[in-house]
């Protein structure tokens, strides 16, 4: 395994932005695992399938074409909700596990963001961050993002979605979203993007120093 930077956290916490900036800084490939689950969810919806059917969802996950990650539909609000619903199925997570762990084995390193990277996908990652923010802050960020994409959505609905996704992601039996014991907590509630990135960079630099990189 190369030098893995594991970035976990709830929806709209800023982890995706932080992960992307870290990948660019160190020249490492980036895997947004949330897009995998979003792509599975979109594929199920496209086929008029049932997101709550674990067997059907697993079949879709095992047949997933990675080119689906480039579709605009995977970044919509509906895709996010679908991802959270199908991610509760152990079979779906198992189907995507090998792909994620193969990515984590890349040399000289990689950046992977998601909800169970530091606990399940790459538990021995030398650099682990758990990026979070208050639900109201995350809801406002997501609301502004969706409005900017042309979606007509109320802030209150987004906040309700955030609470539901947090409960679902943290309460699932298989690989629940939780901070790894050795992950550094990064609360971005009062931070700008630059401040969050700078804090994350310092966390990673400390880890690199411990590993003499």
Swiss-Prot record:
Location within or outside the cell: Cytoplasm
GO cellular component, one term: cytoplasm
EC identifiers of the protein: 2.7.4.25
GO MF annotations in UniProt: ATP binding; CMP kinase activity; dCMP kinase activity
GO biological process assignments: pyrimidine nucleotide metabolic process
Catalytic activity: CMP + ATP = CDP + ADP; dCMP + ATP = dCDP + ADP
Taxonomic superkingdom: Bacteria
Keyword annotations from UniProtKB, A to Z: ATP-binding, Cytoplasm, Kinase, Nucleotide-binding, Transferase
Cited NCBIfam families: cmk
Name recorded for this polypeptide: Cytidylate kinase
Organism listed in the record: Caulobacter vibrioides (strain NA1000 / CB15N)
UniProt lineage: Bacteria, Pseudomonadati, Pseudomonadota, Alphaproteobacteria, Caulobacterales
Name of the coding gene: cmk
């Amino acid at each position: 395994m190369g030098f893995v930077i594991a970035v976990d956290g709830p929806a709209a916490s800023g982890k995706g932005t932080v992960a992307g900036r870290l990948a660019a800084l160190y020249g490492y490939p980036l895997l947004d695992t949330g897009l995998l689950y979003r792509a599975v969810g979109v594929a199920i919806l496209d086929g008029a399938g049932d997101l709550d059917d674990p067997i059907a969802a697993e079949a879709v996950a095992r047949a997933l074409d990675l080119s689906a990650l480039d579709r605009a539909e995977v970044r919509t609000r509906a895709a996010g909700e679908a991802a959270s619903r199908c991610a509760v199925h152990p079979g779906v997570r198992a189907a995507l596990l090998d792909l994620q762990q193969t990515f984590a084995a890349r040399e000289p390193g990689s950046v992977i963001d998601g909800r169970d990277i530091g606990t399940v996908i790459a538990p021995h990652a030398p650099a682990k961050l758990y990026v979070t923010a208050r639900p109201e802050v995350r809801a406002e960020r997501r609301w502004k993002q969706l409005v900017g994409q042309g979606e007509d959505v109320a802030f209150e609905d987004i906040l309700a979605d955030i609470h539901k996704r947090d409960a679902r992601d943290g309460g699932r039996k298989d690989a629940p979203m939780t901070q790894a014991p050795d992950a550094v907590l990064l609360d971005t509630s009062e931070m700008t993007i630059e401040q969050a990135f700078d804090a994350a960079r310092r966390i990673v630099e400390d880890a690199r120093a411990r590993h003499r990189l």
